[in-house]
Amino acid sequence: TLLFFHGNAGNLQNRIYKLNEIAELELNYLIIAYRGFSGNEGKPTEEGLYNDSMAAKRWLNSNNIDDSNIILYGESLGTAVAVDLGSKFPFAGIILESPFTSMVELSKIYYPYLPVNLLLKDRYDSINKISKITFPKLVMHGDKDNIVPFSMGKRMFESFSEPKFSYFKSGDDHMMDFDQELLGNIKNFINELN
C-alpha cells in the first residue's frame, strides 16, 4: 500500500493524474488531505500535518495493513511529512519527490535578509531525521527545480544510509514529469522491496 502525502500547493483534485499512473503499478494507495487543505477545517501546521499522517497510518493498521507493507510517498512539503513518519516506524520503503532538507534552510534561500531561524515556527527538519530511516529509500528530483534547489534533493540522498536509490532527471522542474521513465524507476524500487 502506498501512503501518499502531497505538497504545499496541492490538493486531492490536482493529484488524480499521479494516482491514475500509480494505479498501473497494481498497488493499493491512500492519499490524505491535510487539515487546511482540500476544504478541510483547521490550520496546516507542522504538528498538525504530522498528526494527520499518524491518523492515516493508524487507519491503515486498523484495516490489517502492517507498517512493513506500507510505502511512504511524499512530494515537496509531503516529503517532510513522510520523513517524520518514517523516522518513527519501520515501513517497507519511502519515496521522496523534490525533497527539501529543512524549512529553515529553504527559507534562508528565499529570505536571506531575515532571521528565519528565529521567525519560523514550522521547521520541517528532515535532514536531521533521516538517520533514523533504515528501510529502502528512493529520492527523485529534477535538476531545473525552481522552488526547492536540486542540491537539497542530492544532499538528502547523500545523507541517507543504504539501501538507497535515486532518480535525478535532467530538465525536470519542481513538479516532475510523471512519465513512463519516472514510473519505471518507482516500479523498479518497489520490486527491490519484494
Where do the protein language model's features map onto the residues?
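Short alpha-helix in the alpha/beta-hydrolase fold that links the catalytic acid
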Residues: 18, 126, 135, 149-158
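Acidic catalytic loop of the alpha/beta-hydrolase fold
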Residues: 143-148, 174-176
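Primarily recognizes the serine-hydrolase "nucleophile elbow" in alpha/beta-hydrolase
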Residues: 59-63, 67-113
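Active-site nucleophile elbow and catalytic-triad environment of alpha/beta-hydrolase enzymes
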Residues: 115-129, 135
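Catalytic histidine neighborhood in serine/cysteine hydrolases
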Residues: 154-175
